[in-house]
Design a protein with these regions (language model features):
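N-terminal hydrophobic alpha-helix used for membrane targeting or insertion
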Residues: 7-9, 38-39
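Positively charged n-region of N-terminal signal peptides that target proteins for export
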Residues: 1-5
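Hydrophobic h-region of N-terminal signal peptides that target proteins for export
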Residues: 10-18
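Extracellular/lumen-exposed scaffold segments
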Residues: 18-148
Length: 148
């Protein structure tokens, strides 16, 4: 009976603690061919209401910018830098600087030059997400995007 009580307690603690894990950003990926040797990789962040992630282009001394890191491959080469749409920008009194961010949804794009008919674009995105009262620690999310 004592073992059963302990097991039940641990199950309840597990359910309660998992309910407190915040994941306000979900990521989706796809690749779109634009020619026989070129493609655009699209990396979409869907952001919960009230939360935001930061632009790739922030001055040092502010919050953590979003960063894309692509694994080297013989199957493709990056063509330029990862692009983003125009962010919302405001002056932050705490940081004493302009801060650029995205709410709701944002699609980042990376052009690639293909060296083979198919490829897998692998890498990670590092981002920080905040709402009006808190920021979560920067998080790494790995991805692998097939290009067919």
């Amino acid at each position: 009976m004592k073992k059963l009580s302990i097991l039940f307690f641990l199950m309840i603690v597990g359910v309660v603690s998992s309910a407190q894990i915040l994941k306000p950003v979900s990521w989706a990926y796809k690749a779109k061919r634009i020619s026989k040797t070129e493609a655009v990789v699209q990396i979409r962040a869907t952001i919960d209401q009230g939360w935001h992630i930061y632009s790739q282009h922030l001055a040092p001394g502010g919050p953590d910018a979003t960063v894309f890191t692509f694994a080297p491959s013989k199957d493709f080469a990056l063509n330029g830098k990862t692009t983003e749409p125009k962010p919302t920008t405001y002056f932050d009194k705490s940081y004493k600087m302009n801060i650029s961010y995205f709410e709701n949804q944002v699609v980042f794009q990376q052009k690639i030059k293909l060296n083979k008919a198919t490829a897998a674009v692998k890498g990670k995105v590092t981002f920080m997400v905040c709402d009006d009262t808190q920021c979560l620690p920067a998080e790494d999310v790995n991805f692998s995007i097939p290009v067919k």
